[in-house]
Amino acid sequence: MMAASLLRRDKKSTAAHLKADLKRTDNSSGLRQLQELLDSVLNPERGSDPEALDWCKWLLAGGDGFDEFCRTVRSYDNATLCGLVWTANFVAYRCRTCGISPCMSLCAECFNNGDHTGHDFNMFRSQAGGACDCGDGNVMRESGFCNRHRLKTGENVPSVPRDLLLMSEMVLPRFIITIIQYLRDGYTEPESAADRDLQKVLQQLDPHISFLEELTKMGGAMRTVLTKILTDQQTFKELSMGQEDNVYAKKNYEKYLSALKSSGLVSVEEKGAAGGAGDGTSDAAAGAGALSLLGATATASLDDSSKEEDQDGLQGVGQRKRVKLSSSTKDPSIMDTLKHKCFLEELLFWTIKYEFPQKMVTFLLNMLPDQDYKITFTKTFVQHYAFIMKTLMKSHESDTMSNRIVHISVQLFSNEELARHVTEECQLLDIMVTVLLYMMESCLIKSELQDEENNRHVVVNCGEALLKNNTYWPLVSDFINILSHQSVAKRFLEDHSLLLLWMSFVSFFQGMNLNKRELNEHVEFESQTYYAAFAAELEACAQPMWGLLTHCKVKETQDYTKTVVRYCLETLQMWFDAIGFVDEPSLNQLTFHLPLHRYYAMFLSKGVKCQGLDLDSLLPDQEMLMKIMVHPLQIQASLSEIHSNMWVRNGLQIKGQAMTYVQSHFCNSMIDPDIYLLQVCASRLDPDYFISSVFERFKVVDLLTMASQHQNAVLDSEQERPMLEGALTFLVILCSLRIHLGMSDDEILRAEMVSQLCMNDRTHSSLLDLIPENPNPKSGVVPGSCSFEEMLSGVADFKAPVFEPGGSMQQGMYTPKAEVWEKEFDPIMVILRTVYRRDVQSAMDRYSAFLKQSGVHTGNPWPPYKERTPLHPCYKGLVRLLHCKTLHIVIFTLLYKIWMDHQNMSEHVLCMVLYLIELGLDNQVQDDKVEEEPCIEEHCHDSWFPGTSLLSNLHHVINFVRVRVPETAPEVERKRERERERETPPSTSSESATFGQNLREAQVFSLVAERRRKFQEIINRSNHEASQAVRPKSSASRWLPPGTPPQLVTEILEIRESMLSLLVKLHQKLSAKQNSLSLSWLAEVDPAHHAHGDGLTAIERILAKASARSRHSKRCLQEICGKVCPPIPPKKISPGDKKSMDKEERRQRARERQQKLLAEFASRQKSFMETAMDVESPEADAVMDVSSEESLDSEVLYDCVICGQSGPSTEDRPTGLVVLLQASSVLGHRCRSDMPKRLPTTDEEHIYPEDTCGATHDVRLSLMQRYFKDSSCLQSVSIGWDGGVYVQTCGHTLHIDCHKSYMESLRNDQVLQGISVDKGEFTCPLCRQFANSVLPCRPGRGMETGAWHAPSTKSMSTLVKEVEDLQEQLGIFPVRASIKQRDPILIESNLSKEMESVIKDIKNTTQKKYMDYGKNPGSPDNDFLFMYSVARTNLELELVHRGGNLCSGGASAAAKRSCLNQLFHVLAMHMRLYSIDSAYNPWTRLTLSTQSRENEYCDEERPEVPMLFRDVPSLLIIFILTMPQPLRKEHFTCVVKVLYSLQFTQALAALSIRFSREERLAWSNTGAAKKNLPNSDKSWESLLGHMISELTKAKDVYDTNSEETSALSSSVWSPQSIEFRLQQFCLPFLRLSCLLQHHLYGDSLPGCLVEEEFSLLTRCLGLAASVQCSGSMSSAACLEWNISAFDLISQWCSEVVALSDTPSQQSASLLGQDPQWAAPRLLQLPDNYNTIFQYYHRKSCSSCGKTPKDPALCLVCGAFVCLKGHCCKQQGVCECVLHSQHCGAATGIFLLINASVIIIIRGHRFCLWGSVYLDAHGEEDRDLRRGKPLYLCEERYRVLEQQWVAHTFDHINKRWGPHYNGL
């Protein structure tokens, strides 16, 4: 009842009243009232209504306003942490210098307020969300705190008054339980309801949760209250059950209980089925229990019977596999259903159930700065961990959910204290490992490796969603995160049962993703599961391994290593048993995944390297070693097979696997441990056994015979060579790689860096990426640590970013120093690290280029031999590989085969053989000091070599060898021939016969048999009898292919060579000289000189080493060299061999021919490119240069680039220039000042567009149109500053009819990108420059030569009259058809048709708004204005391109490519259509003093524009264009003179306005005094005086702004400064006239100094013929008046005076125009990109107020636009495109804020230009992925600006695409 009355009163007073009640000591009535009120307000059945929230706010505030309350609470904030929580895509910072945990991150504010100068930091876009760690000493060093969190704020904050938060403590528990009840009620199991129901519930709750979030942001005081409520178990008990009478609450509670039921890892029913096995004592029962707990498939029954069988099999596997490990799940409670004791736990529970809604996550995280809360929350999180992962596996949105989970867990587990705490108290490690196992068990399948039928091993199935979508990563990343803490990792390593569990987890990945080689047809479906497999091994196995390894660095941790190694071996043994492995790997199977082997290898390596363990103590017996060796060796052989195209039928993915295996992110967790493991095996097993295993695995055993022919049962002959090369290369890598065998970390880093740099020059970031770093972030080899930088500067030189003339931009690159090539280039390391085989070639090419350049060696060098770092003593056994007979026999055989030119040998084979010999010579075995004598009879090859030392075996001569050859082999035939020659049997002395007999017994050699024998020997060391019973030679029988090969027969070959003699003979063969090594050679050899070179050098180096190390060898060598005999040619070459040799030779010759042709072609192409392509270079082909001066009066000939004919342009078949028309606003963006405008980066800065050239001209025109006659206005100014049409050409010409057919062919060709043929676009057929129109060339002579140039002697007045007459003849066009507007009956020639069509193109180039400035659009006046403005635009732009003046003379590139001459004629022809009414012809007003016309003004509604207001260059262009062509030069000069006087007068007027009143008076007096002197019309003083006195008549022209002007011109005007001002004012007009004269008459433009420009131009234009002294040129001296100057000036002034009705300041502003403009510039950008980024990436869009997803900036005007934003779309066109049309007439240059790159929009196309911001290493950072600080690269920005001004975007940038208005 009372509640109702309370509800009726206003909220404020109620709240105040209740608060007063509750403050009393006896507050029971207050409590009761509050409870009742809350019952009715917060009744959850009413749903969420805003009213309830409102009540809560008032109640919390207890009578104050809520905002006020917030402020008060904030003032008590005692938090020392920032704790700002952000969501995905937020921009945060990470500083590695300050971080203790690798996950440390800072918000932008804390980062910018801290001092991180010189630190290793980067900016990043958050993937999953995060929180700011500023102030948290567990995660980062205090030095990095920002100045706000550096002070321990807690100490000086007053304690909170009790009553402030009293109401909060009362109200909030009820508020929270309301939310919880709502969540309970809304929840339905996802199976039954659609996900969107959950979304709906969340939407309705949104305001409530937002309110909670708001509260958390109030600071420490409020957080404490919330923590208390959330963790208080008593309140939870009271409120959670629901009161008995409340049905709604009860119903909820039941829903909640049912939801809880399914929260265990295993649901209740399954548990029932397992029958409480958890309590069972017997091992089996416990196993079954654990099995059911682990959610195995035991209880799952499937309908499908076939599935069921499969399942049964699996279940058996599962049980047998897991009985061992089940008992170690210590605490079954991990798996049980959850029980909740406080609000926090239930809130988290619902957060999980609803799949982590963002708001809830943020609320829970916002509370973390509260320490008590942090601990409780972490425990709660761990308690729910299993449940979270279970939910994740079922979720449909696993990606978003993963991100949210990691968002939370990374905040909790990065803190070592917390992690240790929950590991100890809540068994975090057990939970994680168990959950991981549980996860993976959902996707196990039977392994098919080795014994497919009886294999008992299970592996994960990489095709399952769990692996394919990386669903496991949140779990694994948490696991890696906690293992990075030493205390946690030690616990893990000490807990043996956990380790065992972990090993069984790792074994799920052992042998996954098995490949079977396809032998018959190509595989139908290429599965891409391999990437999931590699990712899984790297993330789930390798990274935790690296994490553990970082804690095994010191002697004290030896035991950990021993334990891990022991368990690895046990698990491996179990694995071998499970897959049924005996001793031979099964054929044609390959898996790249052996994580158990790799764990074993890495812990071995660590133990030996860091913990001083003895290797032998960690190794198993020989038999186990042999087993361990098999699979890694299989991978190495298969790599070779894949590169030999033997797996080609398995599709591309198998190549992908081979590449991923060695790729930089994987190699140190995959190939490196594999090779290390093989090195360990090789150092401990019998070397003969190991070597023969290698050749057998590589399938090249059959090739290793002395016979010239053989049969290989397993390889095609074209695969033999690559496989042999592979086997030898592998042996070389095995013997020479030292990564785990004794190199220090620095040496490894250096070697890695050198090998990457040798392949290619690299950017800093790609180098960081390519150097395999220890994947665990805490490992200390942090990329970018100082040692990386030091190392880099040690081995490489930095090449600054440069530009190529084509405009493609280079990044800053590092390139190896010369001494690196000389001493450190290691081809073996390069081969090991290359993903693509072509990189090896690239490294060799670069190496040989270096040798050529430094003059060391000019030929084709061989890979250099590199000395190795010494072996760690533990691995000395590896050297025995190089000193075993088997290897020596192989080497001997191969040397012999190469010398005899047997097939399938190659240079690479020889190279590797020599490498092995040299390795052997450099690594002697220590034990045998005495050279062994063959004292013991060995079974098989005692007579090949006496001992095992390579040195002594080198000179051992082998006489006879017995070989098995096919009957067809040449050896057999040779023997038959011999027998035919001597019918008698060989009569030799008996001893030699026995000798031969002896040989026949011995010299047979079978690798396979040898290997079997050794294997047997090792296995049966104990019983001798068994060693006799060698297994039957299964290999031979098993490998025989079907079909009947020719019979094998045994033959004896006579050899009589030793390895030394073979080397000498090979030397002779390579050098093609008979006695290439003289006796004296040995004496003078110096091995150091032989470091670089080809095969000869290598052989010489080896021989030198051999003779230096053994006297015996030296003697033998001298004998051999002494005997020097011609190399024994192979006796008879069988025709087959001959053919193959010829073939080789022919191929070689063909290759040489091809090289020659290619070189010739390249040089031709280069010379063409230089002449035709180079856009910038002025030396273009003179042929195409249309404006080149012709000495003769002949017609100009043009070359057509399509049909190749040369001829004049005629009326019927006109020729045209290839041109590109584009609208341009570059001129309109010019400003007065030379300094570019700055880009605003704060709210205070702005850019004002009013002062640009375009804006000024617009204002001027509209001002005129207000007061003067429209048609006259349209002739008084030029338009085209914005959106003017610019015409440029590449200088090539073509027949217009040829062009049309060319366009047709393009139309049918669909492949052209970025060119729309419908719009007339094409590329020039010769130089491929982009173009879109053809400008017809006028028939006739090139330049007006001869008579037209004769200097004129006529007087000025005659010329003026002639010009006037010429203007009268408008209609007469000097072509055969006279064209008049009103005369339609005309024959149009082809030429005029083309001209019309070009005019149409020109009009279509720009937008309508840039053409219609008149009152009535489309009128002839308007058209007339547009046409002459096109000429003006092109002249002005050429001036800009020449640097704004003509000082540089005629050599400018612009002139060469200029088409102004042609353009002028086309425009002139078009303008001839309009006649200027002679009554209004400005010429008369310029040259006659006509007083008669004043009275005519009265009938006009508006006056014409006074002469002084008109734009002089416009008049010039109008006159020239409307007079008949060709114009005599004298007439041109006359027009210029007349207009110059007008320009000069305007200059005086503009100047006089700037004077103060006193100055005006003074100057007018001076002028009056000089007026009567002779030549006064050529002195500016008199003219100025006259002008001032005339203009003073006008009503207040001068009085308008006298105050401001006087302020402006505080400096006094001296005569010099006035003269300078006048010259500057006239210069723009003179420049344009001069340029026009240059194009029309071909006059050259001499260069000069800037100071002399005025005098030079006046001389060129013939204004200053009389005045010769160039020194002090007076501007007035150039005037030539045809009538009295003073009269004319008075008349012009009177026109202004007559404008009585115009307001005076307008007249003044029209008079005071200034024609000078600075060059166009882009905005000035700040040096540091961060300045732009921080201001703009958060700036909101002006139209919708939200922060745009892709903000962009216009670099021309600074506008802030949304790229692709839908908010700013107009008629389907997005904002960037719109802005480009508005600001740049369809050219836009935009900087994309979030990507730091610039895009160019040109019309309907766009392209990515690149970035002008580079990091410290000269690299772009597109999309800010690396987030390193970026700095403005001035050169690049200049290039961008230059391309903009020169309009060359279309030519220089190649990759254009259509934007469909979507940008």
From Swiss-Prot:
- Which pathway is recorded for this entry? Protein modification; protein ubiquitination
Cite the residue ranges of zinc fingers (UBR-type): 80-151
Identification of the protein by name: E3 ubiquitin-protein ligase ubr3
Enumerate the InterPro entries for this protein: E3_ligase_UBR-like_C (IPR044046), UBR1-like (IPR039164), UBR1-like_winged-helix (IPR055194), Znf_RING (IPR001841), Znf_UBR (IPR003126)
Q: Does the keyword Transferase apply?
A: yes
Which residue stretches belong to region Disordered? 302-330, 970-995, 1128-1152
Function (record text): E3 ubiquitin-protein ligase which is a component of the N-end rule pathway. Recognizes and binds to proteins bearing specific N-terminal residues, leading to their ubiquitination and subsequent degradation. Positively regulates hedgehog/shh-signaling pathways that function in eye development, neuronal specification and somite development. Activation of shh up-regulates transcription of ubr3, which in turn promotes hedgehog/shh signaling possibly by controlling negative regulators such as Kif7.
Phenotype upon knockout is: Heterozygotes fail to form cohesive and stratified epithelium in their optic vesicles. Average somite angle is increased by 30% and the posterior central nervous system displays a gain of Rohon-Beard sensory neurons. Defects are the result of decreased Hh/shh-signaling demonstrated by the reduced expression of the Hh/shh target gene ptch2.
The EC number(s) given in the record are 2.3.2.27
Family listed:
Belongs to the E3 ubiquitin-protein ligase UBR1-like family.
| A GO CC term assigned to this protein in UniProt | ubiquitin ligase complex
Q: What class of enzyme is it?
A: transferase
Q: Does the keyword Endoplasmic reticulum apply?
A: no
